[in-house]
Amino acid sequence: MKSKTGVLLGRLMRNIMRSPDTIITVAITPIMMMLLFVYVFGGAIKTGTENYVNYLLPGILLMAIASGVAYTSVRLFMDVKSGLMARFITMPIKRSSILWAHVLTSLVANVLTIVVVILVALLMGFRSSANILDWLAVAGILGMFTLALTWLAIIPGLKARSMEGATAYSYPLVFLPFISSAFVPTETMPKIVRAFAENQPVTSIVNAIRALLYEGTVGNDIWIALAWCVGIMIISYFFASKAFKRQLG
């Protein structure tokens, strides 16, 4: 399975490298949001920190991932509609390799996007006191979040009837950081909005990453964040597998 998955992964990565504008496009939106919030709104937002880009970066990284996984749906949808998926199914390869290749491609592509966003944040003044273990923990959380959303993206990629349908699911995911602690403290929100913000996955993930990067108190946020990621991944994997079995006929 590993060798077959590697071959399929190589095919998808070559497609991405032939059109690097995909990664650039995915990175541009969160970078533009970061520029807008830091240089236009940053002075008016009270977060209790002097460096707003430090406060903002964790949420921007999650937004970049949410934007990036949408391309998983697109790539899978194109494989299905072009008949390439049907050809793969007839080949002597383990069928799960087909989906895992798309999942790993999403993981690699999002790593590249995250690196680009962090480099831009460094130019804007981002600084962290995190040690190597903290950074590894941050990488682990971001990786789990990417895998969770990628398996979620597999479902519309297999079931959508149009390109628009394959990408539309990502819109709520990109919007979630706006109703979380990503941009402003939840304490400043109206009660109903605050109740939602404090009990959705992005807030706990953002808080955990922020604490790891800036020597804060991680507390239960990291376990809640991991529970959200694992829960979304398991549920998405289950429904993606069912959708794939229907695709196999």
Predicted features along the sequence, with ranges:
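Membrane-interfacial helix-loop-helix junctions in multi-pass membrane proteins
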Residues: 15, 46-47, 180-234
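Hydrophobic alpha-helical transmembrane segments of multi-pass membrane transport proteins
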Residues: 32-37, 53-124, 156, 169-172, ...
